From Swiss-Prot:
List of residues binding L-tyrosine: 35, 168, 172
Tagged with keyword DNA-binding: no
Catalytic reaction list: tRNA(Tyr) + L-tyrosine + ATP = L-tyrosyl-tRNA(Tyr) + AMP + diphosphate + H(+)
Sequence similarity: Belongs to the class-I aminoacyl-tRNA synthetase family. TyrS type 1 subfamily.
Single Gene Ontology MF annotation: tyrosine-tRNA ligase activity
Positions occupied by motif 'HIGH' region: 40-49
EC code: 6.1.1.1
Function: Catalyzes the attachment of tyrosine to tRNA(Tyr) in a two-step reaction: tyrosine is first activated by ATP to form Tyr-AMP and then transferred to the acceptor end of tRNA(Tyr).
Disulfide bonds: none
The S4 RNA-binding domain, residue ranges: 340-404
Keywords assigned: Aminoacyl-tRNA synthetase, ATP-binding, Cytoplasm, Ligase, Nucleotide-binding, Protein biosynthesis, RNA-binding
Main location: cytoplasm
Protein name: Tyrosine--tRNA ligase
Length: 406
């Protein structure tokens, strides 16, 4: 029988283990309960969360039971990991609104029927803790000296770390202990930026409960240059269609760099790895076919098959000259002009009367390339922008132009 760990490793999910051999044996011999925490600092999940949910879904498909832990309690404190300044504190009402919204989204990705998965909120136990009891029962197991060496604290010490935030590691560690006692949860999964907090939880369960506990981190979603994916210049790529439309969501994946196609197919779809490798090996114009598969599959998972088809058809109509696009004015440029600022190209081809007018258009949010809003006046026209030999420019609500290479 195949071990789900092998599939997770093959797809590139796993970055670090606390106990690799123990984890392998446990997943081979038992159907375990594991958890991933989600921070409710917004009323929607974004693509950074989606990779964690795919991690959960692969584990669930292999027969293991996930707990999706929403941090309604820890959000009252704020996670200092990866932050250079203290987070803005949310009200209880804001947090509860976000928790309710995220719960609805999660139920689309993870099967919670018949006890196959559990939704939990750490506010249920953290908000009613007695502080003195907590210090005696949990604080005694943590070394301040060791905590100060954790990466999540080190980068904050120079600018100032509040005692409020310093408690976050204890609270997250206690989450693991609580879930271990209540659901026999033996494993935590999470992003690699949570490594220090996850180690704290594993050690607390092992010391306080004398039980099996381990953790593994999943790869953060980065592109070939090491930059976080799922972020646009305008902000996060949300899973909520009211925040990021299914079409814009589709177009984001349709426009990823060639070098990132195979990685995204492996991490963000359920396509078999043989097919992932075949698509990832395509070159030249053929890689556009792989990008269409990537965009369709991810949009289908997040927004459903109907919305994925609509997004695909809309994109095809725009680039194939569908009913509304059949008479789109087309300009041609020399290949040497690829790599120039889009404002220069548009001005030289008379798509815009002047670069000043183009800057105004961008600043007002009225210019898009291939369905994606241009956020900065220094946007460069790249080779990746050419889909099926053309770039579609939209000005305002109804004005379109195509740019093709001579």
């Amino acid at each position: 029988m195949a071990n789900v760990l092998d599939e997770l490793l093959e797809r590139g999910y796993i970055k670090q283990f606390t106990h690799e051999e123990e984890t392998r044996k446990l997943l081979e011999n038992e159907k375990i309960t594991f958890y991933i925490g989600f921070d409710p600092t917004a009323d929607s999940l974004h693509v950074g969360h989606f990779i964690a949910m795919m991690f959960m879904a692969h584990m669930q498909r292999a027969g293991h039971r996930p707990i999706a832990l929403i941090g309604g309690g820890t959000a009252m404190v704020g996670d200092p990991s990866g932050k250079t300044d203290m987070r803005k504190m949310l009200t209880k009402e804001d947090i509860q609104h976000n928790v309710d919204s995220i719960k609805k989204q999660m139920e689309r990705f993870i099967d919670f029927s018949d006890g196959k998965a559990i939704l939990a909120n750490n506010a249920d136990w953290l908000l009613n803790l007695n502080y003195v009891d907590f210090l005696r029962e949990v604080g005694v197991h943590f070394s301040v000296n060791r905590m100060l060496t954790a990466e999540c604290f080190k980068q904050r010490l120079e600018k100032g770390l509040s005692f409020l935030e310093f408690n976050y590691m204890l609270m997250q560690g206690y989450d693991f202990y609580e879930l271990n006692q209540k659901y026999n949860c033996k494993m935590q999964l999470g992003g690699d930026d949570q490594w220090s907090n996850m180690i704290a939880g594993v050690e607390l369960v092992r010391r306080k409960a004398q039980g099996e506990a381990m953790a593994m981190t999943c790869t953060l979603l980065t592109n070939s240059q090491g930059q976080k994916m799922g972020k646009t210049v305008g902000g996060a790529l949300w899973l909520d269609p009211a925040k990021t439309s299914p079409y814009d969501f589709y177009q984001y994946w349709r426009n990823v760099d060639d070098a990132d196609v195979e990685k995204c197919l492996a991490l963000l779809t359920f396509l078999p790895m043989d097919e992932v490798r075949r698509l990832g090996a395509l070159e030249g114009a053929e890689i556009n076919g792989a990008k269409k598969v990537l965009a369709y599959e991810i949009t289908k998972l997040v927004h459903g098959e109907e919305e994925a088809k609509k997004a695909e058809e809309a994109a095809t109509a725009l680039f194939a000259g569908g009913a509304d696009m059949s008479n789109v004015p087309t300009v041609t440029i020399a290949k040497e002009e690829i790599g120039l600022p889009i404002l220069d190209v548009m001005a030289s081809t008379k798509i815009i009367p002047s670069k000043k007018e183009g800057r105004r258009l961008i600043e007002q949010g009225g210019l898009s390339i291939n369905g994606v809003k241009v956020e900065g006046v220094n946007r460069i026209l790249t080779e990746e922008d050419f889909q099926d030999g053309a770039v579609l420019i939209k000005r305002g609500k109804k004005n379109y132009n195509k740019i093709e290479i001579k």
